[in-house]
Amino acid sequence: MTSCHIAEEHIQKVAIFGGTHGNELTGVFLVKHWLENGAEIQRTGLEVKPFITNPRAVKKCTRYIDCDLNRIFDLENLGKKMSEDLPYEVRRAQEINHLFGPKDSEDSYDIIFDLHNTTSNMGCTLILEDSRNNFLIQMFHYIKTSLAPLPCYVYLIEHPSLKYATTRSIAKYPVGIEVGPQPQGVLRADILDQMRKMIKHALDFIHHFNEGKEFPPCAIEVYKIIEKVDYPRDENGEIAAIIHPNLQDQDWKPLHPGDPMFLTLDGKTIPLGGDCTVYPVFVNEAAYYEKKEAFAKTTKLTLNAKSIRCCLH
């Protein structure tokens, strides 16, 4: 018999989150649709729960009410004593943790798909938090293969000092899905179709896995975050240069030392320094102006996964 890495157990509980950011409308629209008619997301033997994560922000069509829901799922915020004085999103995070967690427990949901849009030209993107997770690498390989020839990129946010504390991190297997470009507060049919297909293929993978299909060893190309880059700023902290036209919409493309990065209003080009080629992502993302992030630098690498098969009882 072929030796293989056996994944822990079959997958039982899956959640699909929309509206973690209330103005990213593809996930909101799909989740609302699936709450009314969820036939397309159901798979035999699998509990799939669509869920609106930040209903107040969705109602106002804004990213958040008090603070970013997708950055506060750490033990400090989840452990705060519940009171009306807490920011709305912290209270909501505790409610979500109660419903789908608790985080880092045996009772937490197996998989959470968190649906997002970006204003950046990132196409279909899967966000991975753990480079050693054979199950998710296999799932992402399946999704990428199923979507081809449509490109699907994998963004690895594993980093020693950049801690995200994402909404989906309460699950055993957290999956971020990011599709763009799409303006905030807008629905685009092409973007919706791409996100819908990503979810379909992900659920198909889980179904095949649960039925005992063995997935042979595989490898995927990923883009691992190195650092986030702020806009150049003046002495008052105001933005002093904008994304250069040569960099705009060039997510995932190589940016070499000396290539144009920013452009000042008086026409001066600010190039990339250093001696390493990087791959920019979230270029000129609207939501990241407040976070002082013009783009993120990534490096390209390959992740390998062992063969996996479900432990059938």
Curated annotation (Swiss-Prot):
Variant or mutagenesis effect after changing Q248R: In CAND; <1% residual enzyme activity
Record annotation: effect of changing A57V: In CAND; <1% residual enzyme activity
A Gene Ontology molecular function term of the record: aspartoacylase activity
Reaction(s) this enzyme catalyzes, per UniProt: an N-acyl-L-aspartate + H2O = a carboxylate + L-aspartate; N-acetyl-L-aspartate + H2O = L-aspartate + acetate
Organs and tissues of expression: Brain white matter, skeletal muscle, kidney, adrenal glands, lung and liver.
Function text: Catalyzes the deacetylation of N-acetylaspartic acid (NAA) to produce acetate and L-aspartate. NAA occurs in high concentration in brain and its hydrolysis NAA plays a significant part in the maintenance of intact white matter. In other tissues it acts as a scavenger of NAA from body fluids.
Protein name stated in the entry: Aspartoacylase
